Each structure stands twice: as C-alpha cells, then as structure tokens.
C-alpha cells in the first residue's frame, strides 16, 4: 500500500467521468466532497439515489437517499449491514480497520461496492437472507 492520499479533485474527476449526470459539492476549506448519483444494480433493479460524503484521508460514508425509507424484508425490524438504520448509511467495509485506504479511487471501489450492496439488498427483500 502506498499510503498516498488521492486529492479530492482527482477523485471527483473520475466520479464525473464514469457518472456524468451526477451532482457534487466540494468544499476545499474542509477537504470534503459530497457526491450524489443514481445506481441501478441490474436491469431489473430499482434505481437508487446514493450520496457519498468523503473527507480527505478518512473513510467515505455512503447513504441511500432515495427511496427512503428502504423497504424491509418480511419480519425484519431493521436493515442489515448498515451503520445507521435511520440515515441508511451502508456498511460496505469495516471503517475502524481501515479496510478502505485513501490511496484508492472511490469510483473503482466504493461505488461498485454500493451497487453490490443494493443488489444483495434486493435479494434480501425477496428471500429474507443476506
């Protein structure tokens, strides 16, 4: 691992390249990027609006903005694999273990992981098994 933190402008450039219809806000004073896009994990899937909040050098936080609230599987009380049920903050990796290092591109890691999470979520809705 190189431990080289990728600048926000580079992260944003790649995100905008892959997702030209996305929206973003970048605050250079706080080194924070807020980025929104719509993901559809499969051709049969619903479309989900996600928001990624990334402060330079920290782990990105990923939220499902829409639909909100996300439906629950029959008999379930809470969403599985989330850090925050109400905010719908997805658990894509274990942040305290630094499983996502800041020398990785968000577009190549976090976004595909979020799409995969959404696909597993849809399977969970039908089967009740994550």
Label each residue range with its predicted role.
Residues 88-130:
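Ampiphathic alpha-helical segments that act as solvent-exposed interaction surfaces
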Residues 23-96, 104-105:
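Compact alpha/beta protein-protein interaction domains typified by the UBC
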